[in-house]
């Protein structure tokens, strides 16, 4: 401290002296010293991390034998493609898909459904992954980590289509049936969902698309014929690859990257698997390496935990977004709001007559979509529970168009948002994590300006939940048909619908994808 004080006599030069010894610098140096002191100097090659090896073993050894998983995968496949077609209606989405160099057509390349693009499989994975995620309307998995396992279809479909076209052209490849794609989806769902059940990546600031990258890499490695060891190498490459931060999903930085982050992740997965196929190796202790491994650098030094071995559990229990293009934690809140809109109509009232609104929800919703203040864009609005409740209360609907600037300019929306209070219901939070329930409950109670309190409406699980699968399947297929008709002429729609029944599993994947070519 004496040196610190005496330096004050040297005028401007002392400012430089003091800055170089700020507490932050000292803390940083101590951190570096501690980190350097723990560096491993033993260069003996360790065994492959068990987590990585288990995923590789699952890819190479597990046989899908669940009829429930296969039928759910068929529905998921159709729904995911339909969501992609709907996403293409939005110019911001259409602007970023296609080849990197306009006009490029890759012989025997991946065809992008809903377009006339034919691109390389890496770009194809980005294109397909982006369009299916754009509207936040594809499937969902909720646990310690959240996500949308059908995002992996970007890489799976891109590789299957390219490999099949290449094989039929007499080049290196393999003919894939739709059944193979569905089995790949089941495994990708299981890997992403299995890692998500007990491990919260969001709590360390990482986005859930890290799991898309891991799952897509594993499945695509198997599709490309990589050995068990190469598959483990590719998975390690996915773990070491720079991981996306969640900041683009949260205030004050919410923006459209959240809509193409999964496309980016699944395309990187394809690229990494192809690099390993060409001879690149891996890192056996990518997770557990001291100082430099994933656990120490990105996961707070904690190791992953697992609830169950890999099978077909996730696909069997996956959640479909059927009624609303809304962040899944708000799905049942939207359903409650729709029912309350009808109650208001019966009373001869409108949203203008509302004095206050209380929303009981889960802890996850409180953290992700409880949002105050101005909403700046589409991405902001579809991640705000107050906005997603206000629209049904005002209009009796919630569609993708309701997140646009035109609709959002209605002053009634923000006025209604100001009247809402969100509180966590511990039961909802507990049932959210319970493996035998996986509920996503919300409840809404409205008080009118005249003092009338409407009966609270509680919905524990949405129509896309496994508990309501029988009720939801016809509505899901209607959603698929509606999305087809929004993109193609009726004759083409009928051909796709005719091919999409349960016999679809026997079709070559390129022939099915050809049905989705958009001709101007």
Swiss-Prot record:
Variation of activity with pH: Optimum pH is 6.5-7.0.
Q: How is its activity regulated?
A: Several bivalent metal ions, such as nickel, copper, zinc, mercury, and lead, inhibit the activity to some extent. Inhibited by structural analogs such as citrate, cis-aconitate, isocitrate, 2-methylisocitrate, tricarballylate and fluorocitrate, but not by trans-aconitate or adipate.
Which Pfam families does the entry mention? MmgE_PrpD_C, MmgE_PrpD_N
Give the top-rank taxon of the lineage listed in the UniProt record for this protein. Eukaryota
The reply to whether Transit peptide figures as a keyword in the UniProt entry is yes
EC number of this enzyme: 4.2.1.79
Q: Which GO terms describe its biological process?
A: propionate metabolic process, methylcitrate cycle
Describe the temperature dependence: Optimum temperature is 25-40 degrees Celsius.
State where it is primarily located: mitochondrion
Transit peptide range per the UniProt entry? 1-37
Keyword Transit peptide on entry: yes
One GO MF term attached to the UniProt entry: 2 iron, 2 sulfur cluster binding
Induction context: Slightly repressed by glucose.
| Pathway membership, UniProt | Organic acid metabolism; propanoate degradation
Record note on disruption phenotype: Leads to lipid accumulation and increased citrate production when biodiesel-derived waste glycerol is used as substrate.
Q: Where does this polypeptide localize?
A: Mitochondrion
- Report keywords, A-Z: Lyase, Mitochondrion, Transit peptide
InterPro entries recorded for this chain? Answer: 2Me_IsoCit_deHydtase_PrpD, MmgE/PrpD_sf, MmgE/PrpD_sf_1, MmgE/PrpD_sf_2, MmgE_PrpD, MmgE_PrpD_C, MmgE_PrpD_N
As its record notes, the protein acts as a catalyst of: (2S,3S)-2-methylcitrate = 2-methyl-cis-aconitate + H2O
Which GO CC annotations does the UniProt entry carry?
Answer: mitochondrion
- What family does the entry list? Belongs to the PrpD family.
**What is this protein's function per UniProt?**
Component of the methylcitrate cycle that catalyzes the dehydration of 2-methylcitrate to 2-methyl-cis-aconitate. The methylcitrate cycle is a metabolic pathway for the consumption of propionic acid.
**Subunit composition and interactions:** Monomer.
The protein, known as: 2-methylcitrate dehydratase, mitochondrial
> Taxonomically, what lineage is the organism?
Eukaryota, Fungi, Dikarya, Ascomycota, Saccharomycotina
């Amino acid at each position: 401290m004496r040196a610190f004080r005496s330096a004050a006599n040297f005028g401007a030069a002392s400012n430089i002296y003091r800055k170089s010894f700020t507490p932050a610098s000292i803390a940083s140096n101590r951190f570096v010293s501690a980190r350097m002191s723990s560096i491993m100097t033993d260069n003996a090659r360790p065994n492959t991390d068990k987590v990585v090896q288990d995923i590789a073993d699952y890819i190479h050894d597990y046989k899908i034998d669940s009829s429930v998983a296969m039928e759910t995968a068929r529905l998921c496949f159709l729904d995911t493609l339909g969501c992609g077609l709907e996403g293409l209606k939005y110019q911001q989405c259409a602007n970023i898909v296609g080849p990197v160099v306009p006009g490029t057509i890759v012989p025997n390349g991946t065809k992008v459904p809903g377009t006339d693009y034919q691109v390389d499989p890496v770009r194809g994975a980005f294109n397909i992954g982006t369009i299916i995620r754009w509207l936040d309307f594809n499937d969902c998995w909720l646990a310690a980590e959240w996500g949308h396992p059908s995002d992996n279809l970007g890489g799976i479909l891109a590789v299957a289509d390219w490999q099949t076209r290449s094989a039929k052209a007499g080049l290196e490849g393999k003919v894939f049936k739709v059944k193979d794609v569905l089995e790949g989806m089941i495994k990708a769902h299981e890997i992403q969902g299995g890692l998500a059940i007990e491990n919260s990546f969001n709590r360390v600031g990482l986005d859930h698309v890290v799991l898309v990258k891991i799952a897509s890499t594993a499945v695509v490695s198997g599709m490309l014929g990589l050995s068990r060891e190469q598959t483990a190498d590719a998975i390690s490459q996915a773990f070491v690859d720079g991981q996306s931060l969640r900041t683009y999903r949260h205030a004050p930085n919410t923006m459209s990257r959240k809509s193409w982050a999964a496309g980016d992740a699944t395309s990187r997965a394809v690229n990494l698997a192809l690099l390993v196929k060409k001879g690149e190796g891996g890192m056996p202790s990518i997770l557990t390496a001291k100082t430099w491994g994933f656990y120490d650098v990105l996961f707070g030094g904690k190791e992953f935990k697992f609830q169950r071995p890999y099978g077909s559990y996730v696909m069997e229990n996956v959640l479909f977004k059927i009624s609303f293009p809304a962040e899944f934690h708000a799905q049942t809140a939207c359903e409650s709001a729709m029912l309350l809109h009808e109650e208001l109509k019966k009373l001869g009232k409108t949203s203008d007559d509302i004095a206050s609104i209380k929303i009981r929800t889960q802890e996850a919703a409180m953290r992700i979509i409880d949002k105050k203040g101005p909403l700046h864009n589409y991405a902001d609005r579809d991640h705000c529970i107050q906005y997603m409740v206000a629209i049904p209360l005002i209009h009796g609907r919630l569609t993708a168009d309701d997140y646009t600037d035109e609709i959002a300019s209605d002053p009634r929306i923000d006025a209604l948002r100001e009247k809402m209070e969100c509180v966590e219901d511990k039961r909802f939070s507990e049932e959210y994590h319970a493996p035998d329930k996986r509920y996503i409950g919300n409840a809404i109670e409205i008080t009118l300006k005249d003092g009338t309190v409407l009966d609270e409406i509680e919905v524990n699980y949405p129509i896309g939940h496994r508990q309501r699968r029988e009720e939801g399947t016809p509505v899901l297929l209607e959603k698929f048909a509606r999305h087809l008709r929004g993109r193609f002429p009726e004759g083409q729609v009928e051909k796709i619908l005719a091919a999409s029944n349960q016999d679809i599993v026997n079709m070559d994947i390129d022939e099915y994808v050809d049905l989705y070519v958009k001709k101007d």
